[in-house]
Structures are given as structure tokens and as C-alpha cells.
């Protein structure tokens, strides 16, 4: 019976993934609370559901054959994972409690994945490196070197495959022979931008390509915004390398802050428009200044150690860096007269 329920839930999530925009909080929140099968049944039966979504949602739901969708995806080397799967990164569950930005939010109903590696294992030691699409030579160099060194030190680099800083981050990780995760705004079978098709294939072969949007889906503005929360949600912390005040990188930074995870920034020239956003984050104390991979690792480990020592929340140990896990049992409890470190 439990197996049948799990199958029904997975198929319902496939149907929702094919019909509902990624990060639609009206759905993601309810699915997390009540389950996908129950919410799908409501959407199929509700007479006034069209007035809330603005299109004939019930008809769209009825056109989806989820088993066929999974079969077609598998033929392309694409799998669909959902909360509760052993491969599901449990840290994404924190997105249930972070509200919304630009009407996007919540834990994904599922993720479409390309690549042979295990997403949960890759994400347990991940750092997001994001920044301007119109990166300067300075930004490209900093993103490449930072990501190369992070990967060489055993960290997975998460980014969005965009022009500029994103592609530099992926390339830096690949040069080091390390893991990288590309989170796309459209289907994992659709390289965006098209000029990065070869890079996408390299990541699919040596890393992982992930999307909340189903195979075949194209990128849209709302899907870019939804994608940013997945980038932040997968990572232990986020580094911004260049980014204007209003940019996708700063949106990802806001998600990181909402998740109470370390936000870091590589400072840029005061004369560079590309660095106005990240420089402002640093000036306002919203991001710590980092200049190399060791700075990043120190910030991430310090944050994790404080969270464990302070008991702020029950952390999934797979998400805490190994050096912190190995020492947390030696941390005296508050009953022993040792207070938590100051934030």
C-alpha cells in the first residue's frame, strides 16, 4: 500500500511539473503540506480553478500522461526525483519556510536531473557561485579561479549556466576535475543559452544538470526567478562575483539570506557598474567579503559550526561539512556552562 501511494504521489508530481509554473507558491506550499496526489485531485475537480490560474488548468492536467512523460524522459537519460527519494537533497526542504520573492517560492514538487551522479551527495558540500551575465574580464577571472580552487578542495560548484560569471564558474570547476551542478530555467534537454550547448554536455557527463521545469520547457522570466531559489537552496552558501543592484545574482543573494545561509561577495572596483550590487551587499553587512576559496570555506564552516553549537535548528548532517561533523560531538552543551558563539 505504501509503495502504491508513493507511485501515485510521484505521478501526481510529474503532472504538476508539466502544468504548473516552477515555484508557484499556491501549489508548492499545499503539496508540501497535503501531498501531491490530494492537491492534483482538487485541481482536477474544482469548478472555479480556472479563475485562479487564468487558463483551463483542468484541461491541461487531463492531457498529461505522467507515466509516458517519465518514459520519454528516461529515454533521454533524464530522471525525475521527488522529496523522500534517497537522492533528494533534504536541504531544499528549508524553502518551505522562506516565503516568496517575485511570487516564486516553496520546495519544488520535483526535479528533473541529467547525469549519472547522485544529486544529494553532490549537494552536501556545495557552494553557489553566481554573478553578472555581462561579466568583465575581472569578474570572469575571479569566478574561474574561485570555482577552480573550490572544486580542487572538494566542493561542488553550483551555478546557472548563463553567460558571464555562471559559465566561468562551471568551467573553473571542470578544469579542476571537480563536480559542478548547472541549474537551468528550462528543461535539462534545452541548453540555454544555446551557445553553451557544448558546456552543458560536459556538465551532464561529469557533473549534473538540474531543473524544476520539465524536459522541453523553454526559459521564461518567472522560470529564471524560480531557478534562483534552487541554486541558493542546493548550496551551503552563495558567493556573488559581480552583480548590479537589480540582477539575477542579487535575487539569488536574497534567497540565500532568506535561507539563513552564508552570503559572500567578491568586491569589485568602485568604478565598475557590474560590481555595484555586490559592493553594496558588503557595505551593508549583508554579505561577508571573500577574496579566495579558503575565505569561502572558512565562512561556510564557521556558519555550520555556529548552527550546530547554537542548536538553532536540527540540521541534516549530510549538509554539514565533514570537519564540522567530526567535531560537533566534542562541543559541550549549554548545560556544561559554555554559551553559543556570538553571531
Region roles according to the model:
Residues 1-95, 284:
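Short, small/acidic-rich helices and loops at N termini and domain boundaries
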